[in-house]
């Protein structure tokens, strides 16, 4: 039962109030951020509780990931301030009141929490306004990232005197680049956490394969695998996609009864108690046996997935991995009679995007789409790599050169989306590389996606998650039938 409406939701105890890693980790991260910037104040607001339907009944609290990275605290209502001129770091927030303690039990003071992450100075949340106003009056610049929550926009607007709808235009590109440069290269302790999340995701997908059979609902499987995520951490890392209609890329409707002959697509991941994420996708037959047509298409997607692991490593451009996966898919579809002509030319104009209208993947870490709130132009692209306007490539979240320590996903797929197929045929799209008469035979096929998580290493890459969920057609069939 939530506390009554008079109880401040922002004071409620969270699952992980203590620091995530040791204090030296956070001291070193903040020091590294100081070193990348000069002059002014860096404002890093944490998240507040977000009401579901009343102030006392909130959604599960999720701290802002950049605040977590530099301050490591999972308490609502906190903000961090880095003074780039003096080198001082300050944590702003409020101590629990007696009313809070009655409802949540004893909680550490703000000063105690600050000590766990190596911050020597704390001040009340109300004092942050005075600190910002004093800095602005002296003409000092305030560096901040674009806020993505309504509550944070409102707070930032009040603190900075900038209209909420204009905050993004005042956000600091210099700070964005600095934060991305630090967060995108994962530390060993972070990789261990991501491995835990991947191990949990593997359990989720294996359970789904064992449960899957005609006659049960998608919801039954969704509930079971999300329970596994909660048993082993903080729950799912994003709303699970559990569907026998894989042609809908982000399908969150769980009401269908599973039918023999359909393919089940599950895109689901876990989040650890320390908020590190995983993201796997598997596609398998509802009745435990692939048809010949399903196997043919599945093996093309698996070959594209395998090709990305052959390529990935330091200095490889991610857009090249996408293009190579696209070539494998195009050549495979040509072998089935769905595409025709020179496939290099076809991929050059994006004809394969009819079947894979999304990019190959994304970075992953404290966010499942890591740092996406900061902006893809910083996370996925840079001065060296600009986004393409070609179909397929235009949807690629990341194209830039990979570095050792990156954690990325690879998720090629083939989908037969009736509305998209009709549009392309009606408008004469595809450059003559699509055999629409043959494609129409697949309108009831659905979709297939295979997604794994990988770490970029000095020598190339390695798959994360230990015991990889079954991925070959033979392995899936054996596992689903008790093997």
Regions found by a protein language model. Give the residues of each.
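Active-site neighborhoods and metal-handling regions in enzymes and metal-associated proteins
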Residues: 3-483
């Amino acid at each position: 039962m939530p506390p009554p409406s008079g109880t401040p939701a922002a004071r409620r105890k969270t699952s992980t109030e203590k620091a995530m890693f040791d204090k030296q980790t956070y001291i070193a991260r903040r020091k590294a951020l100081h070193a990348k910037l000069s002059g002014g104040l860096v404002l890093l607001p944490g998240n507040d509780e977000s009401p579901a339907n009343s102030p006392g009944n909130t959604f599960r609290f999720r701290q802002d990931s950049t605040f977590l990275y530099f301050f490591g605290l999972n308490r609502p209502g906190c903000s961090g301030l880095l003074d780039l001129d003096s080198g001082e770091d300050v944590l702003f927030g409020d101590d629990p009141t007696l009313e809070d303690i009655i409802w949540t039990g004893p909680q550490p003071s703000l000063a105690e929490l600050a000590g766990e992450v190596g911050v020597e100075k704390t001040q009340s949340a109300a004092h942050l306004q005075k600190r910002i106003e004093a800095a602005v009056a002296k003409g000092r610049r305030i560096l901040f990232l674009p806020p993505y929550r309504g509550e944070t926009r409102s707070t930032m607007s009040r603190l900075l005197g900038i209209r909420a709808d204009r905050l993004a235009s005042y956000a600091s590109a210099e700070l964005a680049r600095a934060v991305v440069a630090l967060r995108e290269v994962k530390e060993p302790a972070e990789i261990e956490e991501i491995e835990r999340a991947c191990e949990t995701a593997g359990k989720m997908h294996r359970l789904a394969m064992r449960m899957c059979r005609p006659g049960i609902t998608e919801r039954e499987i969704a509930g079971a695998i999300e329970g596994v995520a909660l048993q082993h951490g903080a729950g799912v890392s994003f709303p699970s996609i559990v569907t026998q209609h894989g042609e809908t890329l982000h399908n969150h409707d769980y009401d269908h009864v599973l039918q023999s002959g359909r393919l089940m697509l599950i895109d689901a991941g876990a989040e650890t108690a320390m908020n590190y994420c995983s993201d796997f996708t598997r596609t398998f037959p509802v009745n435990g046996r692939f048809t010949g047509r399903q196997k043919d298409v599945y093996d093309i997607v698996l070959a594209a997935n395998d090709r990305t692991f052959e390529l990935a490593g330091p200095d490889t451009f991610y857009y090249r991995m996408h293009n190579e996966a696209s070539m494998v898919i195009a050549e495979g579809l040509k072998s089935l009679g769905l595409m025709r002509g020179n496939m290099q030319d076809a991929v050059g104009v994006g004809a394969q995007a009819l079947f894979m209208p999304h990019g190959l993947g994304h970075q992953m870490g404290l966010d499942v789409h890591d740092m996406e709130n900061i902006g893809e132009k910083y996370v996925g692209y840079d001065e060296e790599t600009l986004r393409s306007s070609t179909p397929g490539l235009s949807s690629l979240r990341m194209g830039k050169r990979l570095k050792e320590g990156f954690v990325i996903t690879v998720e090629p797929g083939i989908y037969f989306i009736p509305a998209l197929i009709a549009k392309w045929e009606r408008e004469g799209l595809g450059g003559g590389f699509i055999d629409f008469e043959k494609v129409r035979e697949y309108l009831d096929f659905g979709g297939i996606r295979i997604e794994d998580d990988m770490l970029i290493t000095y020598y190339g890459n390695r798959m994360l998650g230990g015991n990889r969920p079954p991925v070959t057609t033979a392995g899936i069939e054996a596992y689903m039938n008790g093997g």
